[in-house]
A protein has these predicted regions:
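Solvent-exposed loop and edge beta-strand segments that line ligand/cofactor-binding
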Residues: 2-4, 17, 54-71, 110-125, ...
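Low-complexity, Ser/Thr/Pro/Gly-enriched N-terminal "stalk/linker" regions
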Residues: 2-70, 88-110, 139
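Well-ordered alpha-helical scaffold segments within catalytic/enzyme domains
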Residues: 24-26, 30-32, 73-88, 124-138, ...
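Extended ligand-binding groove/face enriched in aromatic
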Residues: 60-64, 72, 81-209
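Catalytic-core region of carbohydrate-active enzymes that cleave or remodel glycosidic bonds
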Residues: 236-261, 280-328, 339-340
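C-terminal beta-rich recognition modules with glycine/proline-rich loops and embedded aromatic residues
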Residues: 251, 310-318, 323-422, 428-431, ...
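Beta-strand-rich binding/interaction modules
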Residues: 435-456
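Solvent-exposed beta-strand/loop surfaces of large extracellular or lumenal domains
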Residues: 449-475, 492-497
Length: 622
């Protein structure tokens, strides 16, 4: 399959800092391979069997059923998962959708179910088709999309973007750019300029952000998933305008406005449908988690800011696993940082319904049931990128392998690591031709700056003094190994609630409470469950107490309760006065907190491994 990640000669688009490698160039290994395997065995691999909207009746495979976004959403995760795993069963599941879509094109270029003419779901389908083409080389995709985009350019002045499509126009442009880089068709640039003009001007909104408080009224501009998808807007616009620094400033303004006003300890921003503030009991929608990861990957690839990789890892290794059951059959519509009862009870302030915090097949709107599947596969496929100098870049760390051409030579890379549960990353470079010279760009996380070190082919260690990029350019020989040591010390983060959260490297830690899962309705494996605490949750951290790092072997599912391969032991005390506010925790008591309860040793576990947890805790006197 041709690799179009290198810049096309004569392209009118600004080159990204790190171009996306085609689907399949990066594949999961180690515990990440296990994670995707669990996903294939869980809901993603069987959704059409248990949920008609993504089964044979879906209008996106010629049926008489759902004709809007659910089929496209599902494919946006199913297709990359199938190709990353080379899973024949998953590929067979996707095939009827792909074949029907490609056969549905009308003479004017429009396509899809006749019952629905919304631009928005076709934006998702275009992303699906570009991934399918990258992985398979299907020659039908480019002509199909050319016909569709010609139709879109002709029709948009008469039938402009509206509602969801207006909020999410940037995703449409991504596929337009993909096609332009392969065909050079000038009209695609006209379409890429028109789409953002018809969309919401998100950067203008962020520069004077009016939505800093928790929102109580519906508007597309406060919708949490729209916000997550909008993050990529500056990246999309700057490639055509070449105003890279202006759009970088817009990106920074957006990140500051959103996370300062609504950021949570686990790395995401809150929105239990609408932007919801910083309180640890406000919800975070699963769709927003997976869409934020994809948007941040686009931002990192476009602008090259290493801190975006830190942000990606924080979300992927905390909020992403937390939103599903360990077997990846069930999910929550909304998760909470302080989550001690996942019950069908209306939470104060939430616009989402009473079931949104439970685990099930469709605990609230079905968008998350359809859309959650892209989270892990797209994270894996964006772990590496191609730098402007022709080298390769490690954008986020995790066990994987890479196979691509570098300066005309096939090169394989094996990234051997149990990161983020361990601090060491080994990168083994295997060029087909010994002695090929190219740069390797290695991201230095903020938490490792000054303490990290890098060893190349057994030479003397090099200190990683500053966060950003450490570049190694050399003549690579098969088996040359780069070893990164990225040590991280546990740290307490003061939160707006008055409580503290604990982080170590990319992992956020929580006090994980023993869990009692109760089936409420339906049949396994897609029954609806509430989850209750099987022990006390109201602990505070002793002020000034240190942390002992404890490790265990990394199991197949490191995000299962009781299976955490990395834990922090510290001292804590019960706080009897810290109780519930309805079904959620009350705000952490304001320090200084005095309690007569004895000091105990408590263990904190990675956030993603605890479905009943307290992440923001009060500090108590020792």
């Amino acid at each position: 399959v041709p690799d179009h990640s290198a810049p096309r000669a004569g392209s009118a688009l600004a080159a990204p800092a790190f171009a996306h490698l085609p689907l399949g160039a990066v594949r999961p290994a180690g515990w990440l391979r296990d994670q995707l395997g669990i996903q294939s065995e869980g809901l993603t691999g069987h959704l059409g069997e248990v949920w008609p909207d993504c089964g044979p009746r879906s209008a996106w495979r010629g049926g008489d059923g759902e004709a809007w976004e659910r089929g496209p959403y599902y494919l946006d995760g199913l297709v990359p998962l199938a190709h990353l795993l080379k899973d024949a069963r998953l590929l067979r599941t996707a095939e009827p959708f792909i074949e029907w879509i490609l056969a549905s094109g009308r003479p004017d270029g429009f396509f899809g179910p006749a019952a629905n003419d919304d631009w928005w779901p076709r934006m998702v389908v275009a992303k699906v088709l570009t991934q399918h083409a990258e992985a398979t080389g299907d020659p039908r995709v480019a002509p199909f999309l050319l016909r569709y985009f010609r139709h879109q350019l002709d029709a948009l002045p008469r039938r402009p973007l509206r509602a969801w499509g207006q909020a999410r126009a940037a995703d449409n442009v991504l596929s337009v750019y993909w096609l332009y880089e392969r065909t050079g068709e000038p009209f695609l640039l006209d379409l890429a300029e028109l789409l953002p003009r018809q969309g919401i001007d998100w950067p203008a909104l962020w520069r004077d952000f009016p939505y800093r408080a928790p929102q109580t009224r519906w508007d597309h501009r406060v919708h949490v998933v729209n916000t997550a998808m909008a993050l990529k807007f500056p990246a999309v616009r700057c490639r055509l305008s070449h105003q890279v620094e202006a759009e970088r400033a817009n990106m920074a303004a957006g990140i500051a406005a959103i996370w300062e006003s609504h950021g949570q300890a686990h790395g995401m921003f809150a929105g239990d449908e609408w932007l919801a503030g910083t309180a640890p009991t406000r919800g975070v929608e699963t769709c927003a988690v997976v869409e934020s990861l994809f948007s941040l990957a686009i931002l990192l690839g476009t602008f090259g800011d290493a801190a975006l990789g830190d942000r990606i890892e924080r979300i992927a290794y905390n909020a992403l696993p937390a939103c599903q059951s360990p077997d990846q059959w069930l999910h929550q519509y909304d998760q909470q940082a302080n989550q001690v009862r996942c019950t069908p009870v209306q939470r104060p302030g939430w616009s989402n319904g009473e079931w949104a915090n439970t685990f099930g097949l469709e605990p609230h709107f079905g968008c998350c049931t359809a859309n959650l599947h892209q989270g892990w596969p797209k994270f894996v496929s964006h772990l590496w990128g191609r730098a402007q100098d022709g080298g390769l870049a490690a954008l986020a760390y995790g066990p994987c392998s890479v196979r691509t051409d570098v300066r005309g030579t096939p090169v394989a890379i094996e990234e051997e690591t149990d990161y983020p549960f361990r601090d060491e990353v080994r990168i083994v470079v295997r060029p087909d031709t010994p002695g090929v010279r190219f740069p390797l760009h290695l991201r230095v996380p903020e938490w490792a700056a000054g303490e990290g070190r890098c060893t190349v082919a057994g030479e003397a260690p090099i200190p990683l003094a500053a966060a950003g990029w450490h570049v190694i350019e050399r003549d690579w020989r098969p088996g040359d190994t780069v070893t990164l040591h990225l040590p991280a010390a546990p740290e307490r983060i003061r939160r707006p609630s008055g409580g503290v959260a604990v982080r170590r490297g990319p992992l956020v830690f929580a006090y994980g409470v023993a869990e009692e899962w109760r089936r409420l309705r339906g049949e396994d494996p897609v029954a609806d469950y509430e989850v209750l605490p099987a022990g006390p949750w109201n602990y505070g951290l002793v002020q000034g107490a240190g942390f002992e790092v404890r490790t265990a072997p990394v199991p197949r599912q490191p995000f299962a309760s009781g299976a955490a391969p990395l834990r922090l032991a510290t001292r804590g005390r019960r706080v009897p006065g810290w109780t519930l506010d309805g079904a959620s925790t009350a705000p952490p008591p304001v320090p200084p907190v005095v309690t007569a309860e004895p000091v105990e040793e408590i263990e904190l576990v990675p956030y993603g491994s605890a479905r009943i947890r307290v992440t923001e805790m009060p500090e108590v006197e020792g």
